[in-house]
């Protein structure tokens, strides 16, 4: 992450992995989800030189962004997705650092996983209602710089 920052990135996300992938099928499912997110979304976006998306933990944001916004101003239920959407709208590119790996402990019960996924779904809709129209407009005017809500929240 330090090299990514030193190369001029103002925000970057890491490869988020599951610490307890071998606990059961639920935690293993999260590991597969994170692998998909890393390889097929963020790595692809890095290759195409478009903005990646912050998801959960394991990311950095430069002090410049925090200062310019008067602190951390993103407070929707899924503030990571909100930050990503807002960054795209402001023309800030989020990078991806594939060599930085963060291990998160994931839910192992269906109930905990369900509750978390339900919270994420509600957060997605919050971001969609706050940012969806502006993101869609950005797709029409500058397809490379913008991302649709469905793409950013994948």
Q: Can you say where each PLM-predicted feature lies in the sequence?
A:
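Short, hydrophobic alpha-helical packing/hinge segments within bilobed ligand-binding/sensory domains
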Residues: 83-84, 113
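Structural detector for helix-capping/boundary residues
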Residues: 63-64, 81, 100
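Structural beta-strand/beta-sheet cores of well-ordered domains, especially the beta-sheet scaffolds
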Residues: 57, 90-92, 111
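Long helical/loop segments within the catalytic core of UDP-sugar-dependent glycosyltransferases
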Residues: 2-76, 114, 118, 125-129
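Catalytic donor-sugar/metal-binding loop of nucleotide-sugar-dependent glycosyltransferases
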Residues: 49, 75, 84-102
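Nucleotide-sugar donor-binding loop of glycosyltransferases
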Residues: 15, 80, 98
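Basic/Trp-rich segment in TM-proximal cytosolic loops or flexible interdomain/linker regions
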Residues: 48-49, 108-154
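Generic structural signal for helix capping and beta-alpha/helix-loop junctions
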Residues: 21, 104-105
């Amino acid at each position: 992450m330090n090299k990514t920052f030193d190369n001029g990135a103002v925000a970057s996300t890491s490869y988020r992995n599951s610490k307890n992938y071998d606990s059961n099928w639920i935690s293993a499912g999260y590991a597969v989800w994170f692998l998909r997110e890393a390889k097929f979304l963020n790595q692809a976006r890095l290759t195409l030189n478009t903005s990646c998306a912050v998801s959960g933990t394991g990311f950095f944001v430069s002090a410049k962004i925090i200062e310019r916004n008067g602190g951390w101003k993103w407070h929707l239920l899924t503030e990571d997705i909100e930050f990503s959407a807002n960054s795209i709208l402001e023309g800030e590119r989020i990078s991806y650092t594939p060599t930085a790996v963060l291990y998160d402990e994931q839910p192992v019960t269906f109930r905990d996983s369900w509750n978390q996924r339900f919270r994420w779904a509600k957060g997605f809709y919050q971001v969609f209602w706050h940012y969806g129209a502006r993101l869609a407009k950005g797709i029409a005017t500058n397809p490379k710089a913008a991302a649709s809500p469905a793409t950013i929240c994948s």
